[in-house]
Amino acid sequence: RGLAVLEGIEADLQPDGWRLGAGEGADLRRARSLLAQDLDTAEELGGTFFRALKIQVAGPLTLAAMVERPRGDKMLADHGARREIAESLAEGLRTHIADVRRRFSGANIVVQVDEPSIVAVMTGGIPTASGFGRHRSVQPPEADALLRMITSSITDAGARPVMHSCAPDLPVELLAGAGFAAISFDLGLAKPADVWAETFEQGVDLWVGVVPSLDARVSDAEIASMIETFFSQLGFDGDAYADRLVVTPTCGMAGASPGWARTALSLAQTVAARR
């Protein structure tokens, strides 16, 4: 999905993953076609009924860690390539958001930028092509610059940028400073700390990932209690976060059964409504 949005960069799916190429490969054409079909279906079924609509893409750091250069190894290995993919994503998002806004003119658009690899990228945890080494870590100033390209393009297009990652030890201060309006995270991996409280006080919303992504026995009361405990440890009572609370699954739901996906979304709605 992230590659389907890129502007001016073509790629093809190889046996070992996506690789940049001279032209648009069949798999990238298919990805772009599926994206258009998804929007067509949503427009047909939802039309003007959406008050808010969330779209999502892989972020620049994660893309750089996943996509290979034409001659091999990840784009992460090259400073210029990292910047190129961020610029391409920023430009592509402007076009993508404009298309979504044309289809859903009355909706408030939220763009979720998925960065599951951000911690590994910034701590030197991404293996090289040989598997015997690790790519150098991307330092905070560069990570900030790359993410700012994305948040600026989203904001300029009239949408709301939200960062999502299920990784532990997120660089919360960096994300807040990069222009994200909200941070979506796995509550089970977040340690209550001053940085979360400071971020929330600065106006960055916290999207609390607390509903299990896979089938589980849990009640809305138990989920609500976990949220209340977290915010209480940060020094906030219910009134402080009631109007800013967004309840989400802990991480992606690709592995969930259809039945649990429905249950999880229902639980999230019920818990959010309790406030």
What kind of feature is each model-predicted range?
Residues 51-59, 109-114, 161-165, 181-185, ...:
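Hydrophobic faces of well-ordered beta-strands that scaffold small-molecule active sites
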Residues 88, 92-192:
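Active-site loop segments of alpha/beta catalytic cores
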Residues 59-61, 115-117, 167-169, 189, ...:
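Active-site-proximal loop/turn and secondary-structure-junction residues that shape catalytic pockets
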Residues 45, 103, 149, 153-157, ...:
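Alpha-helical structural signal in soluble globular domains
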Residues 27-43, 83-96, 221-229:
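Glycine-rich anion/phosphate-binding loops
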Residues 1-58, 62-82, 174-179, 204, ...:
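Alpha/beta catalytic barrel-like cores
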Residues 181-274:
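Catalytic-face loop-and-helix region of soluble metabolic enzyme cores
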Residues 47-50, 102-107, 156-158, 237-243:
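Short helix-terminating capping/connector loops at secondary-structure junctions
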